[in-house]
A protein has these predicted regions:
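C-terminal motif of bacterial Sec signal peptides marking the signal peptidase cleavage site
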Residues: 13-17
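Bacterial signal peptide processing site
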Residues: 19-21
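Short, non-transmembrane alpha-helical segments in secretory-pathway proteins
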Residues: 36-42, 50, 127-160
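Short aromatic-glycine-enriched beta-strand elements
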Residues: 59-67
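Beta-strand/loop nucleic-acid-binding surfaces
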Residues: 73-93
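Flexible glycine-rich surface loops and low-complexity tracts that mediate binding to linear polymers
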Residues: 92-113
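A short, surface-exposed beta-strand/turn
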Residues: 179-192
Length: 192
């Protein structure tokens, strides 16, 4: 009987040693606390951010729209739905036309369209400049969004569907649409 109790105590002791608690360290040099278990809601290594193009910038916030269309018409929703988010707390160097990935604050997102969130981190996704091009992609997008065609379309939330550069004609073609629109504007931007 004594052997069974000792064996049971050893098993309990071994099992309790297997449990782990987060290891917390305090760095006295910078007064910060870190944990061996990252915050999966805030750590961008564990969460994809919202990827899209910056299409508007006003009042210290930017509107980012995603070019991938979703069809929710089978459930009574939009046939041409494009995700869009207004972000506050964005660095001042973020400009219209840039392709970005934005990580939002946990729980700050709203359900309205476009959504609203506070940016925790923003990364500009660099696109290579095509051989022979004078402009970079973000400059061509900025010119397209400022064009009279886009102004005439009166898009509240423009979406950059696609960007192409034609080296033989030395021009960019920017395809622009918006939520609920099947129609896509084809904006030509001279490479100057």
């Amino acid at each position: 009987m004594r052997l069974k109790i000792i064996t049971l105590l050893i098993c309990i002791l071994a099992l309790s040693a297997c449990g782990s608690k987060p290891e917390i360290t305090i760095d006295s040099d910078v007064n910060s606390v870190s944990s061996s278990h990252p915050d999966l809601n805030q750590d961008k290594r564990f969460n994809d951010g919202f990827v899209g193009f910056v299409v508007k910038k006003e009042n210290n916030q930017v509107l980012v729209t995603n070019p991938n269309v979703q069809d929710f018409s089978a459930n009574g929703g939009e046939k041409y739905y494009y995700s869009a988010e207004w972000y506050t707390n964005v660095p001042s160097n973020i400009e219209i036309g840039q392709k970005v990935e934005v990580w939002g604050a946990d729980g700050a997102k709203t359900t309205q369209y476009p959504g609203r969130d506070t940016a925790v981190d923003v990364e500009v996704l660099q696109t290579p400049q095509p051989d022979g091009a004078n402009l970079i992609e973000e400059d061509a997008i900025r010119k397209a969004l400022a064009s009279k065609e886009v102004a005439a379309a009166n898009y509240s939330w423009p979406v950059i569907k696609e960007v192409k550069y034609d080296i033989s004609k030395s021009r960019w073609t920017i395809f622009v649409t918006q939520m609920s629109e099947e129609k896509v504007l084809e904006i030509i931007v001279d490479d100057k």
